[in-house]
Amino acid sequence: QKRGLIYKYFKIALSNLSSKKNFYITKRRDSSSLKKTIDNSSIYLQDVYIDKSISINVEELSKFKDLIMKMPEPRALKIDVQGGEFDLLKGSEGILKKFKYIFIEISFFNIYLETGSCENIFKILCNEGFKEIFSYNKLIRRDKLISKDYLFEKDI
């Protein structure tokens, strides 16, 4: 517990299927992902290129339902998975309704391969009963909106 927040760390990645996958570690460590970077990613983000890869266990968020249900309400979920947001949400349908708030980074210009569109991310959240209430932290490079963080609230 830190600053009144309760959290746990797990050495796994979240996506839409339970499996074992490559996790691509980029030179800029906070940009590492289950997704490979596009060839010219460094044009937009200088140190976002693959340095090495490791094999990692991948699970669906729903696998943590019991742990989620033990969390005090209102529950909040922070999603920042470097291009894997759509896949994570696809593997979370049904469990998302247990959260009141979702903080999510959404990319508009993909620097990762095989990502879902921002429109589909918004569609899943809308279908799960969430509405956008705030956006912040725009990342702009070379006059392109790369990503932005959003806060969604469960529409009761």
Describe the residue ranges of each PLM region.
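Phosphate/nucleotide-binding beta-alpha loop and adjacent structural elements of enzyme active sites
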Residues: 1-156
